[in-house]
Amino acid sequence: MDTARIAVVGAGVVGLSTAVCISKLVPRCSVTIISDKFTPDTTSDVAAGMLIPHTYPDTPIHTQKQWFRETFNHLFAIANSAEAGDAGVHLVSGWQIFQSTPTEEVPFWADVVLGFRKMTEAELKKFPQYVFGQAFTTLKCECPAYLPWLEKRIKGSGGWTLTRRIEDLWELHPSFDIVVNCSGLGSRQLAGDSKIFPVRGQVLQVQAPWVEHFIRDGSGLTYIYPGTSHVTLGGTRQKGDWNLSPDAENSREILSRCCALEPSLHGACNIREKVGLRPYRPGVRLQTELLARDGQRLPVVHHYGHGSGGISVHWGTALEAARLVSECVHALRTPIPKSNL
């Protein structure tokens, strides 16, 4: 096999970053991204894009930390380059606050973000309902800019994009030698995975340019994330809810909660509502599967199920997925020894 033909199904931040990593790590390959939705219509486009890790209960902490560190380092390099504006990546400082002292005062990712420290009593006076807080600088990755930036890199290295809805991964055989499944919630159908389910997230995007620091309730439910063109206010966490239409009551609750943390938001204007469905499962699925029909085989690398933590770990998990693809390519290129029987 000369050129390995690789299809990546899914064009959110997970699919595109995986395609970039494959093109870097796997020699002599062609990469095609196939999806029925590309930016600006993906779930990733709704995400606020703050690098504050979600914890996966079924994944060892050292693995999660490695994923986060690799992602942080990748985006930090972009933030410190001339590409930062085009890629939508920048540093942002702020506070994560708690109404009771958390059991883990120093989270596993504290030495990856910049300047992590306990908030002072003077800082906590801004939040009278809160008793404990963490101050740090992290990165914000804005997908409406970052996804086109990734696409540009994929096409620049000879990759392709194809707008098409896939009903069955086997459709891609024999046109492709290897398939990488980054379809998120689509994996309920494409991989028969009943463990994955939607968690609906609604956010507001508002104009409030005076808000320069992020504020996040330790529960992760209420947050204020300033960006380059707007401030994102959140949020909701509705398990099993497939509704993509904005809910007016949700919007009122979000605005009320965020104004309680930052009263100046009463003056915010140009409020836009956005909804996305996070692909939740107990842990990210990073696994190779060999599909077989009628004596034919199709290696599939599954890479999905990041929930609300996708942007925080996307590059780390994409590197791992690319390594699995590299193993598949090596296996396909290794001749099967002839039997002496």
Swiss-Prot record:
Which residue numbers does the motif Microbody targeting signal cover?
339-341
The tissues where this chain's protein is expressed are given as: Expressed in epithelial cells of the proximal nephron tubules in the renal cortex (at protein level). In the brain, expressed in the frontal, temporal, and occipital lobes of the cortex, hippocampus, striatum, diencephalon, brainstem, cerebellum, spinal cord, plexus choroiderus and ependyma (at protein level). Expression is increased in the prefrontal cortex of schizophrenic patients. Levels are normal in the superior frontal gyrus of patients with Alzheimer's disease.
Q: How does activity depend on pH?
A: Optimum pH is 8.3-12.5.
What Enzyme Commission number(s) appear in the record?
Answer: 1.4.3.1
- GO BP terms, alphabetized: aspartate catabolic process; aspartate metabolic process; D-amino acid catabolic process; grooming behavior; hormone metabolic process; insemination; nervous system process; regulation of cell communication
Q: Which Gene3D superfamilies match?
A: D-Amino Acid Oxidase, subunit A, domain 2, NAD(P)-binding Rossmann-like Domain
Its activity depends on temperature as follows: Optimum temperature is 45 degrees Celsius.
Cellular compartments per GO CC: cytoplasm; cytosol; peroxisomal matrix; peroxisome
InterPro entries with a match to the protein in the record: D-amino_acid_oxidase_CS, DAO, FAD-dep_OxRdtase
What cofactor does this protein call for?
FAD
Main localisation, per the record? other
PANTHER family, per the entry: D-AMINO ACID OXIDASE, D-ASPARTATE OXIDASE
What is this protein's record name? Answer: D-aspartate oxidase
Coding gene? DDO
